[in-house]
From Swiss-Prot:
GO MF entries: calcium channel regulator activity; toxin activity
Name of the protein in question: Hainantoxin-X.3
The keyword Disulfide bond is annotated on this UniProt entry: yes
Keyword Secreted annotated: yes
Function summary: Reversibly blocks N-type calcium channels (Cav2.2/CACNA1B) in rat dorsal root ganglion cells. Elicits no toxic symptoms in either vertebrates or invertebrates during a period of 48 hours post-injection, when it was assayed in vivo by direct injection into mice and cockroaches.
Similarity-based family: Belongs to the neurotoxin 36 family. 02 subfamily.
Tissue specificity: Expressed by the venom gland.
Broad class of the protein's primary localization: secreted
Gene Ontology cellular component terms for the protein in this record: extracellular region
Top-level taxon: Eukaryota
Signal peptide limits: 1-20
Location in the cell: Secreted
Length: 65
């Protein structure tokens, strides 16, 4: 009887950990806290606030600085 309980607990732990790992991998791509922030390096052309990817620094005279 005790062996059946131990096996049941071990199987449940395995199922729960596999389920949690699967969800943590899918959440990682969706989380804005984990995603790397993309920005344009200095010297690249920029167009102010209407561009999709901002400058890493400041957009000055249509160039990132």
């Amino acid at each position: 009887m005790n062996m059946k309980i131990l096996v049941l607990v071990a199987v449940l732990c395995l199922v729960v950990s596999t389920h949690a790992e699967r969800h943590s991998k899918t959440d990682m791509g969706d989380s804005p806290m984990i995603q790397e922030r993309k920005c344009l390096p200095p010297g690249k052309p920029c167009y102010g606030a209407t561009q999709k990817i901002p400058c890493c620094g400041v957009c000055s005279h249509n160039n990132c600085t």
